[in-house]
Every structure is written in structure tokens, then in C-alpha cells.
């Protein structure tokens, strides 16, 4: 693989890794779970959806029924509503277990896709220089640090490139957060003498 392809691939992987970090795995899990709930044909999810709709209808009927004037009808609706709530809780527990299993595999998939390629690149291309500096650009000790651990002196290797990219993304994130937060306008301090009549 040529150095430019390595640089580009590493940049994309590190940007994806930092995007996951910034957005947060829990937010990604929740978004994917919401999509799964919306478009899934799973029987438990469909049953839960139907039970909630039926429970809402019974609740509306019960609310529109006077407990004093139509006590028998209201009691029947109340019992049905309580029964539906019990069923909803049981089905919700099953769906919650399903959600935990999906989140477990999703978290594993995110971790593998964002960290494994970096480790493979570090191992496979650790001795390949990504680009060279002109001779005597930096002092020899600095060139040695930039080429650490195993590329020729006077070049930048994959380890230092990953370090630079991560630092760049974290600094960029800091700048964006700093300038995007709204700062309250300071309230002027009024001295007691200013309030006294003249």
C-alpha cells in the first residue's frame, strides 16, 4: 500500500473513531434502537405496540366515562386497563432484554470497526515511512522522536501520525466547543453611591 493511501485510510479511521467518541456510544445505540423499533417486524415489538395502542384507547374511554354515573362500565374499563398495563410490563421486559443483547453486539461491532483496523495498520506498516522531511530540517534528536519506533530517521511513521491526528481532532473539538457555547453577558455592578439621590 502506498503512503498516501495509508495516510488517507488512517485519517478516515481516526475521524470515525473520534466521531463515535464525541457523539457517544450510548447515543448511537439509542438511535439505532429507535430505528429498529420503528421498522422491525419482530413479534414482541409488534405486540408491545398493539398493547400500548389498546391501552391508550381504554384509557381514553375510561376518562370519558363517569365513575359515579356508569360505575359498572368504568370498573370494567379500569380492570381492563390494569390488565393491559401488566401485559405491557411483561412484554416490555422481554423487549428490554432484546435491546440489551442488541446493544451488546452493537457496542462490540463499533469497538472492532474503530480499533482493530488501527492495530492492524500499526502492526503491518510500522516500518514504512509515510513521508520524509528535507535533510537537516529538525535536530537529530527531534527527527529520532518523529520516526519512533521503527521508521528511518528523517521520516514520520504511522505511530506519530496517529498521535498527531488524534491531537488535531481533540484540539479542533475544543475550539468548536469553546466558540459554540453561549456566554452570558456580564451584569454591570452598581455601587451603592450611584443609587443615592443627588
Curated annotation (Swiss-Prot):
Compartment(s) where it occurs, according to its Swiss-Prot or TrEMBL record: Endoplasmic reticulum membrane; Golgi apparatus membrane
GO CC annotation terms, alphabetical: endoplasmic reticulum membrane; GET complex; Golgi membrane
Protein's GO biological process: tail-anchored membrane protein insertion into ER membrane; vesicle-mediated transport
MF GO annotations: protein-membrane adaptor activity
Cytoplasmic domain ranges by topology: 27-110, 173-198
Membrane topology of this protein: Multi-pass membrane protein
Transmembrane portions of the chain: 7-26, 111-131, 156-172
Keyword hit for Transmembrane helix: yes
Top-level division of the source organism's lineage: Eukaryota
Coiled-coil features, chain-numbered ranges: 73-106
Key words of the record: Coiled coil, Endoplasmic reticulum, ER-Golgi transport, Golgi apparatus, Membrane, Transmembrane, Transmembrane helix, Transport
Lumenal-side segments: 1-6, 132-155
Family: Belongs to the WRB/GET1 family.
Assembly notes: Component of the Golgi to ER traffic (GET) complex, which is composed of GET1, GET2 and GET3. Within the complex, GET1 and GET2 form a heterotetramer which is stabilized by phosphatidylinositol binding and which binds to the GET3 homodimer.
Functional description taken from the UniProt entry: Required for the post-translational delivery of tail-anchored (TA) proteins to the endoplasmic reticulum. Together with GET2, acts as a membrane receptor for soluble GET3, which recognizes and selectively binds the transmembrane domain of TA proteins in the cytosol. The GET complex cooperates with the HDEL receptor ERD2 to mediate the ATP-dependent retrieval of resident ER proteins that contain a C-terminal H-D-E-L retention signal from the Golgi to the ER.
Protein name: Golgi to ER traffic protein 1
Organism field: Komagataella phaffii (strain GS115 / ATCC 20864)
Amino acid at each position: 500500500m502506498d503512503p498516501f493511501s495509508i495516510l488517507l485510510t488512517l485519517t478516515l479511521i481516526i475521524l470515525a473513531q473520534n466521531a463515535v467518541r464525541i457523539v457517544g456510544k450510548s447515543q448511537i445505540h439509542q438511535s439505532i434502537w429507535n430505528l429498529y423499533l420503528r421498522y422491525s417486524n419482530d413479534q414482541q415489538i409488534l405486540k408491545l405496540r398493539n398493547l400500548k395502542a389498546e391501552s391508550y384507547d381504554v384509557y381514553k374511554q375510561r376518562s370519558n366515562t363517569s365513575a359515579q354515573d356508569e360505575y359498572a362500565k368504568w370498573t370494567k374499563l379500569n380492570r381492563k386497563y390494569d390488565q393491559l398495563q401488566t401485559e405491557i410490563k411483561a412484554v416490555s421486559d422481554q423487549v428490554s432484554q432484546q435491546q440489551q443483547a442488541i446493544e451488546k453486539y452493537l457496542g462490540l461491532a463499533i469497538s472492532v470497526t474503530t480499533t482493530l483496523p488501527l492495530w492492524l495498520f500499526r502492526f503491518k506498516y510500522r516500518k514504512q515511512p509515510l513521508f520524509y522531511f528535507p535533510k537537516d530540517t529538525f535536530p537529530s534528536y527531534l527527527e529520532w522522536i518523529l520516526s519512533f519506533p521503527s521508521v528511518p530517521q528523517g521520516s514520520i511513521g504511522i505511530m506519530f501520525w496517529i498521535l498527531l491526528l488524534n491531537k488535531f481532532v481533540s484540539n479542533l473539538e475544543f475550539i468548536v466547543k469553546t466558540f459554540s457555547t453561549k456566554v452570558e453577558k456580564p451584569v454591570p455592578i452598581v455601587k451603592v453611591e450611584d443609587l443615592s439621590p443627588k
